[in-house]
Amino acid sequence: MKRGEKLDLETAQNEADLVDGGLRYDLTVPLVRFYSNNGANLPNPFKALQIGPVWRADRPQRGRYRQFYQCDIDILGEPSNLAEIELILATTTTLGKLGFKGFEIRINERRIL
């Protein structure tokens, strides 16, 4: 998309179309970019929590919206599994405080299983 062209969400076909229009399609990529540029000045491990609107590039299907909110919790710079455990605990605590009951967390990591 060139400057001056209007972004048409109905015709956006891929992530590049959204990026060209200034719309975030993901919260993780900007975080990794920030960390790679500033990692030397950040605590190690670096913990981040982000909640914000993002947009889908594909045509939304029933029950899926073009715009939705994404919640990311990330720990960067910690090579051990302790970071993974901390993220799982944070997720279960948050879901519990939001009133969700009976949810199940599935681990799909062959080194753990």
Where are these regions (language model features)?
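TRNA-recognition modules of translation machinery and tRNA-sensing kinases, especially anticodon-binding
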Residues: 1-113
